[in-house]
Amino acid sequence: IMELVSPLGGVYQAGTLSGNPVAMAAGMAQLSILREHPQYYEDLNRKGDWFYGQIQRLLEERGKPWQVNHVGSLGCLYFTEQIVEDYQSAKTSDTSFFAKYFNFMLAQGIYLAPSQFEAMFLSVAHTQEMLQKTLERITTFLQKI
């Protein structure tokens, strides 16, 4: 695979921790854990389906036409009525409203990516209790707006 990466191959790759020995060791450890516990992927995807489904349910119950897109454990809440299928439709999101949501969640101890266009990432470390707490904070936000 390394022969495909520049300078030998045609794929350019760069990043903050590229080639960093600590990052490489962490990556190798992670791969070992995943080999030992292949069910983590299935569990994580099920967790994502449930969590993002709950956000969608909360929005629907309150008549909010916003979009919740997700694939497995990755998801994004878009503050737009338009179905989000690509960059153009994502750009219809109300980014100033997202800023209010972000700041509210941050004040509640829920750390999200600071951009409307960055995904939320669930991990095997997220417990049901943590996800429920997040949903409770989202509910509070929806009640306050």
What do the PLM-derived regions correspond to, one by one?
Residues I1-I145:
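Conserved N-terminal phosphate-binding loop of PLP-dependent enzymes in the Aspartate aminotransferase
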